[in-house]
Design a protein with these regions (language model features):
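Basic, Lys/Arg-enriched alpha-helical interface segments
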Residues: 1-67, 76-80, 87-122
Length: 122
């Protein structure tokens, strides 16, 4: 069964600003996530420690000597929500992950909150 992979609306705008070859690379990894879902593990996916969401993960890949990390989490509807990403190469690791996780947590909270009105309508 294929899994749904969606972009948080803020990440979608950031994705559109990326170079097209980098977009293609990210989409190729998103397809792996779509196929394997939560069973996709290292080295492609790893848990993000320090997030307030126990299911917060990072999609990991290299592109043109850059080390990319994309934070995502599975929501209650079983969709992988891509939240934020960036090149962690050449920057302080603690600072990179602190910013990545803070943004991912905030965006995932927003996403979960947006699902609640839908649940009330049922």
């Amino acid at each position: 069964m294929p899994w749904s992979v969606i972009f948080h609306e803020d990440f979608d705008a950031e994705f559109q600003a990326l170079d097209e070859p980098l977009q293609d690379e990210l989409l190729a990894h998103a397809k792996l996530l779509q196929f394997y879902g939560p069973d996709l593990g290292r080295p492609t996916v790893d848990t993000l420690k320090g997030s307030k969401h126990a299911n917060m993960k990072e999609l990991r890949f290299s592109w043109q000597r850059q080390v990319w990390r994309m934070a995502f989490a599975f929501d209650p509807k079983r969709s992988a929500v891509l939240l934020v990403g960036g090149d962690k190469g050449g920057v302080d690791q603690k600072r990179f992950y602190k910013r990545l996780i803070a943004t991912a947590d905030r965006r995932f909270d927003e996403h979960i909150a947006s699902l609640k009105p839908l649940a009330k309508k049922r």
